[in-house]
């Protein structure tokens, strides 16, 4: 599918972005492992989260929905999953594959898990390694680094794991496996990553301790089903925040967005570049939530981004790079080599996409160098099958002279179904 975009005269109005993808995944998983019913409201009905539902149905869990973005999960308890009669297909979802591996590691049965061609190229050894050290038997291509993966779960032992990468998916997989041990499993990270798993484990009844970069979970808890209200996804909101910060005449409010401190790096960086972004109506639900107002405030300034903030905005780098292309001066993004093993090589994909628009951009081994302030020109660009590249290109198209066509834009439905309709709703008009 092609997405056609023209230069915008402003984004105005009040809208809600879809439910958070990370939280939607985790709510289904913990609901399946809990006793009783879990009701998930504002669930993200994107392809990735639907893959998680499909996998747990194959593991014997009764799941109804999504119906009006509500999902009901009838939990089976920690020991209630069934051996799947078919391969578990996680589609394009790295979150589904990595987190469900932690669950499968503790099951007394055999399973095989795979994904689409993109996911089968992404590294899984960072997860299978610690799970094997806990006692799981996992095999696959490149000694268990690439899917398809065959898992023979069973009795696991707790470990103290020091993660070599700043990855919430790795942390979460090990913590989920820790639920099936007799003891305490701990994960230590160099940089803090998103903490949705820890928060949700606590909410469902697990014993979780957090201290100085280490998260520990006590095994064999009794998890109890509950209601989960999923906030709007800050990663989806990021594209609208960038667009409204850059397009003169914009005044946009996004309601009910999750503002977990481990996820709002994009707001911090855009604000430091000069964007006018205000959080209001702050409230604490399952997660911190706020309404966000962003208004055009003149040209942004370049900046340097790296270190501990990178895990807090890793998914937003494509959107941030578009802001950098229109900012005054130079923006350097470092310590983001993890982008090379996302749905695409996002460093190369972002650099190539921005270059097509005429931006001055250079790939770095672990990030990007963007020399801003050049006017962008509409172009035809590829999504590379990556939802975040497609949306970043669409935002660039809103700022470029002439027409822009984003090829392969159907991938946007992975995380932001209805993206183009929402854009049309808040667009003042097209040039």
Curated annotation (Swiss-Prot):
It comes from Pelotomaculum thermopropionicum (strain DSM 13744 / JCM 10971 / SI). It is found in: Cytoplasm. GO terms for biological process: amino acid biosynthetic process; aromatic amino acid family biosynthetic process; chorismate biosynthetic process. Pathway: Metabolic intermediate biosynthesis; chorismate biosynthesis; chorismate from D-erythrose 4-phosphate and phosphoenolpyruvate: step 6/7. Monomer. The keyword Transferase applies. It comes from the Bacteria. GO terms for molecular function: 3-phosphoshikimate 1-carboxyvinyltransferase activity. The gene is aroA. This is 3-phosphoshikimate 1-carboxyvinyltransferase. Phosphoenolpyruvate binds at residues 21, 94, 122, 169, 346, 388.
């Amino acid at each position: 599918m092609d997405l056609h975009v023209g230069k915008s005269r402003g984004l105005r109005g009040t809208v809600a972005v879809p439910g958070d993808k990370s939280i939607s995944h985790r709510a289904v998983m913990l609901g399946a492992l809990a006793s009783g019913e879990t009701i998930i409201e504002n669930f993200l009905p994107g392809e990735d989260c639907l893959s998680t539902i499909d996998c747990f149905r194959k593991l014997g869990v009764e799941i109804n929905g999504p119906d009006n973005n509500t999902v009901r999960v009838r939990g089976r308890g920690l020991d209630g999953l069934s051996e799947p009669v078919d391969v578990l297909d996680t589609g394009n979802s790295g979150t589904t594959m990595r987190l469900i591996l932690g669950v499968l590691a503790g099951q007394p049965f055999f399973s095989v898990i795979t994904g689409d061609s993109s996911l089968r190229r992404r590294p899984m050894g960072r997860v299978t390694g610690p799970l094997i050290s806990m006692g799981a038997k996992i095999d696959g291509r490149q000694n268990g680094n690439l899917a398809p993966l065959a898992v023979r779960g069973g009795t696991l032992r707790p470990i103290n794991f020091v993660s070599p990468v700043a990855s919430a998916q790795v942390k979460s997989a090990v913590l989920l496996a820790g639920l099936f041990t007799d003891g305490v499993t701990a994960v230590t990270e160099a940089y803090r990553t998103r903490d949705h798993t820890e928060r949700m484990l606590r909410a469902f009844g697990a014993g979780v301790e957090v201290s100085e970069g280490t998260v520990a979970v006590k095994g064999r808890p009794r998890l109890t089903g509950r209601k989960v209200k999923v906030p709007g996804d800050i990663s989806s909101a990021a594209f609208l925040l960038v667009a409204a910060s850059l397009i003169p005449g914009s005044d946009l409010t996004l309601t009910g967005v999750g503002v977990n401190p481990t996820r709002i790096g994009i707001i911090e960086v855009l604000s430091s570049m000069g964007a006018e972004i205000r959080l209001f109506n702050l409230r604490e639900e399952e997660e911190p939530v706020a309404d966000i107002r962003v208004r055009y405030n003149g040209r942004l300034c370049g900046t340097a981004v790296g270190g501990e903030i990178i895990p807090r905005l890793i998914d937003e780098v494509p959107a941030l790079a578009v802001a950098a292309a229109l900012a005054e001066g130079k923006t350097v993004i470092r310590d983001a080599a993890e982008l090379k093993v996302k749905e695409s090589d996002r460093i190369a994909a972002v650099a190539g996409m921005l270059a097509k628009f005429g931006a001055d951009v250079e790939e770095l081994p672990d990030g990007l160098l963007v020399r801003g302030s050049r006017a962008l020109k509409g172009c035809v660009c590829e999504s590379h099958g990556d939802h975040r590249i497609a949306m970043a290109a669409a935002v660039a198209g809103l700022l470029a002279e002439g027409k822009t066509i984003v090829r392969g834009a159907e991938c946007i439905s992975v995380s932001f179904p209805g993206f183009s309709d929402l854009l049309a709703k808040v667009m003042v008009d097209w040039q």
